[in-house]
Structures are given as structure tokens and as C-alpha cells.
Amino acid sequence: MRKISPVKFPKTFVCAGAMMVALSTPQAAKADNLSDAMIGAYKTSGLLEQNRALLRATDESVAVAVARLRPIVDFAVTASHRYNRGPTTFGFSDTDTNTLEAGVSLEWLLYDGGASRLSQLAAQETVLSTRQSLLDIEQQVLFSAVQAYVNVLLQQDTVRLRSNNLRLLREELRAAQDRFEVGEVTRTDVALAESRVAGARANLTQSQGDLLEAKATYQQVVGSPINVVAGQPPLPQRVASLQAAESVAMRNHPSLLARQHAVKAAEHTAASTAKNLGPSLRLRADAGHSINLDGGRDSDTSGVSLVLSQRLYGGGSLAAARRADVARLDAEKGALISTQRSVSQAVAAAYVSLEAARASLVSSGEQVRAAQVAFDGIREEATLGARTTLDVLQAEQELLNAQTARVQARANQALAAYQLLQAQGLLTAEHLGLAVEIYDPTLYYNLVKDAPANVSQRSKDLDRVMKALGRN
């Protein structure tokens, strides 16, 4: 496995990170950031482990295809007892024969029109397709970590806003009660304030429950409980245009690359099946030694032969298999077209969502500023008797709504940014430069692609790799 050094963040985020470190407390230094979440998910994902094992199983199909082009050598030992009774001039004769035979046989496919070689190429393309599918799974796992992290951050911000809202409403309730005692407001004003406090308390309880649920989801995805959230994650570099994003996706998206390799594998498989209709040539050889256990003579046998065979009629099974493989090839080509369109649509949707989230964040920021000014003014006017309690409560609700919208827009922007990265096929541990040991699919493949025998040194190396993978 190769070690990938983490990439450098943009200068903006480096400066922000430096300020955070300078102003943070010792407890904040232990906060979990988005990279921690993705690293945890990458290291502990059972889904990734499952698909890595499936990839290793697919690697073995290449070894099986290679083995078809090699000679097959068998060794056999046979102990036999033969009884023979036959007529003679004077009656019947009984004969017992006991023998022990040992022999070696060899069979080697010399020619099959290239069918076995095409099967090997199909297996190699299937391996490449499965590797890309594994990368697609990796993207899904990492995006799940992004969603879990951003949701925890969103719920924490929501709890903070509603806690502050409850505090302000309690202050307003006390103010309404004081003004009621001096006759400035009626009991209705106090009841309105009490109702808003009760509603805010219920909303806060709901938000706290949502936060606990978000933390539980985070632990499920990342594999460890979250401590303190470090804050807003750095956003990926902004793409120049929708066309640029689509161009990157068409070159890099693993699901699209997987389909392309699947089409090539289907082409080789169809060609291999067509070759099976032709003749094949095999070399056969054997050597043996027979021991007569009854005291007779021992004997040695050996022989070699070339066998040219051609199936003349098989009930139509070979032709049916060829047509089926051609149909599967057509199906893979259709799936490739569908995948291309799906990738293009996903890029467009993510790009539009990101642009909308950015615009929404700007608008909600302006809304918060205006709502804060309005709330401060109305609250001050209420102390002078120019505004009612209901005016203050409505202004507070508008401020809370604006702040909540800004928090949601910020979360939507982060999710859309990483969703666009995923849609382009770039949400991988290697591209992000995560400080983890990147899983190298070629390590196992290079050990098995030549179908090593059990007694070879490569087979022993392979056993060590299998044990190491089993411990991970």
C-alpha cells in the first residue's frame, strides 16, 4: 500500500485555521474536523472492506483464465485386484491378479483459436471495471461522512440559535410581566410571551433530540463518536463552469469508467464464445509403472499424442451461448449510455444546487442583518411604549427564522460543494490528500495475475498478504 501525503488547503483556509488554533482553548484543539470524519469512514467502513474483498475475488478470475493456457499434470496411484474365471480343457480356471500402478499424465491446450486468450482479456477488463466500482463505493462512503459531519454542525448551530431564542423570549416574558404590574400592558401580552416561551422550549428540546440523532449517525458512518465539531469545513476549489465540471466527470467518474471497461469485457467474452465454435488442438502424454504383487513381471508404459477435435453438432448450445453474449454486449452498451447521461445530470444538478446555495447564503446573510436591526429597534421602541409585546415577539421570530435560514444555507452550500466533487469523480481519499494509507488494488492483483502455484515463493508472499488483509 502506498502512502499519500495530504494536499495543501487554499491559503484562505490555512489562515482561518491558524486563527482558530491561536484563539482556541485546549479542549477546542481536540475538535473533530471534516478530514477526521472522512479518514475515520475510510478506515472503518465495512462496505469498503466488503468491496475490496470482492475485488480480490475478481482478481482471481484472471489467474483462472491464465491457468487455462498452461499444461495440466495429474498423478495417480491405483491398487487393483482382478479375478478371472474361464473355461479350460479340463474344466474352469480361476486367476487372481493384484497390481499396484503409479502414473503421471499431462494435457496441454495448444490451440483453440484464441478463445482462452480472449477470456483472459475479458477477465482483465472485469478487474479494471471492479476497481472503478470500488472507487465509486469509496466516494459514497466519503460523502456519507461529509453529510454526517455537516448535519452535526447544522444541528449544533440550530440548538445554539434556539437556546439563544429561548433566552431572549424569557427576558421578554419578564419584561412583559414587569410592565403588566405597572399597568403598561395587559394580561394578553403576558400570555403571548408565555406561549412563545413554551413553544421555544419545545423547539429546543426537539433540536437537542435531532442533535443526538445526528451524532449517532456520525458514529455509525465514521466509526467513532464525535467530540467537538471544529467548525465549517473548507470548501473545494470552485469549478470554472458547468461545462468544465462535466468535462472532468466524463474523464474521471468511476461509474462511467467501470461501464467502459464492462463493455470491453463483454466484447472480449463475445469474441471468445465465437472462437469456441472452431477446432482445438491438445497435447496428451502419460507415463506409468505397474507392479505385479503376485510375483509376476513389472511393466512400464508411456505415450504421447496430439488430439485435434472439432465439435460438429452440440444441439445448438454453442450458437445459443454466442447469441447470448452478443445480447449482453448490447446491454452493456446501453448501460454505458444511461450512465453517461446519469453522470451528466448529476453534475448539472450538483452545480445548480451549489450556485443556489451560494446565492441563498448571501441573501440569508442580508436577511439576518436586516432582521437584527429591526429586532433591536422594535425592542428599544417597546421599552418606550411605542411598540407592543406582539411586535417584539414577531421581530424575534423573524430574526430566528433568518438565522436558521442562514445556517441551513451554509450547510447546503457545503453539501452541494462536495456533492459536485463526487459527481465529477474526485471525492476520493487520494484526490483529497487524506492522511491515510491508500488501499492499493494492484498489490494483490500483481501477486495473483500469473496464477502462482502453491509451492512457489509468490504463493508464500500471497499467503502473507492474505493474513495481513484479514487482520485489517
What is each of the regions a protein language model found here?
Residues 121-124, 187-198, 323, 389-397:
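Short, charged, amphipathic alpha-helical segments
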Residues 29-76, 109-110, 225-264, 311-312, ...:
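Bacterial Sec-pathway N-terminal export signals of envelope proteins
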Residues 33, 72-137, 257-269, 274-339, ...:
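Small/polar-residue-enriched beta-strand and adjacent coil segments characteristic
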Residues 2-16, 25:
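Bacterial N-terminal signal peptides that target proteins for export
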Residues 308, 325, 332, 354-357, ...:
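Hydrophobic, well-ordered secondary-structure elements that form the walls
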Residues 3-4, 83, 408-472:
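Acidic, low-complexity, intrinsically disordered peripheral segments
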Residues 20-28:
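C-terminal segment of classical bacterial N-terminal signal peptides
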